[in-house]
Design a protein with these regions (language model features):
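Short, Lys/Arg-enriched, Trp-marked, Pro/Gly-tolerant hinge/linker segments that flank
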Residues: 123-140, 147-214, 227-239
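Basic/polar phosphate-binding segments, predominantly the helix-turn-helix DNA-binding elements
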Residues: 198, 203-242, 250, 259-287
Length: 287
């Protein structure tokens, strides 16, 4: 094999690896929003997970299987997906097909304030979206346009980027016009259980601790919690640890320290779990 052929092959492999690696964008000046994209996600594999943010993404190439709570749909290029905070979901490519997407995660408090300013809520509480997927071309184009503006390193000012974010999410609100989800867990016991887990996610929690906080028996808690949140209390705990880890990594904390602080056995344990739920390594996310 000639040196030219070897060099060409190496460059091709580098491009392939680059296309399959997730890219993240975030800015200290705009802490309420984070963007993620991948050009070739055919090897991506997401386990069921949730976010503490409102998340919206666009499939730009290929097809995937989209799970959101109890719904399962096959979606393709042009689809826009929406995930309310804490809604369990997953989106994975059809086997062997090149798959690309862009995703935005936005702070709930920021979006709630925008909803209030637009007249969609009166009590300053986030209004969840009942719709989980849309084929609206305006939303699709707007999301891609916002991602391009955010990722433009030549534009160092925040005014254009923040204005573009407000414009897009105002359009999301006007287009989807969310309705309040049916009231669940009127007694608040499950909410107390979830809150207790979230506040103590870095500790070595026992099931008895969660039961005591919620005032529920273990059998009822496990059954009702999974029905309400789409995952067991343990899975919810792991998700919260990953959310905590993401926040620490964004601040530049060393991965080994994050692993121990978040309650994982070691860095390898964090690495495996992070990859399974985020479809990226802690190092890729931290960059």
């Amino acid at each position: 094999m000639s040196e030219t052929t070897e060099a060409t092959g190496a460059a091709s492999n580098a491009r392939a690896k680059g296309a399959s690696a997730p890219r993240f964008w975030r800015s200290d000046a705009l802490p309420f929003i984070e963007a993620r994209s991948i050009d070739d996600g055919r090897k991506v594999c997401y386990a069921k997970h949730s976010h503490e943010t409102f998340s919206i993404g666009a499939v730009t190439n290929g097809r995937s299987v989209y799970l959101n709570r109890h719904a399962r749909e096959w979606i393709g290029s042009g689809a826009v997906v929406m995930m309310n905070p804490d809604d369990v979901h997953a989106c994975n490519p059809v086997a062997g097909e090149r798959w690309s997407y862009r995703m935005l995660h936005v702070d709930v408090a920021w979006f709630t304030k925008l909803q209030h300013e637009l007249g969609f809520n009166e009590n300053h509480a986030f209004r969840a979206f009942s719709q989980i997927m849309s084929l609206d071309a305006g939303l699709f184009d707007g999301l891609n346009r916002l991602c391009a503006i955010l990722a433009n390193d030549d534009d160092t000012g925040t005014l254009r980027k923040e204005s573009a974010a407000i414009t897009f999410f105002s359009n999301v609100q006007q287009t989807l016009n969310p309705t309040t989800l049916p009231e669940r867990d009127a007694s608040g016991q499950l909410a107390r259980a979830a809150e207790f887990i979230a506040e103590n996610c870095t500790r070595a929690l026992k099931l008895d601790d969660v039961c005591a906080a919620a005032g529920l028996s273990a059998s009822h808690l496990i059954r009702a919690f999974k029905q309400r949140y789409g995952m067991t209390p343990h899975a919810y705990l792991i998700n919260r640890r990953i959310q905590y880890s993401r926040a620490q990594l964004r601040r530049g904390a060393p991965i080994a320290d994050v692993a121990l602080d978040a309650g994982f056995a070691d860095q390898a344990h964090l690495q495996r779990t992070f990859k399974r739920l985020v479809a990226a390594t802690p190092g890729q996310y931290r960059c």
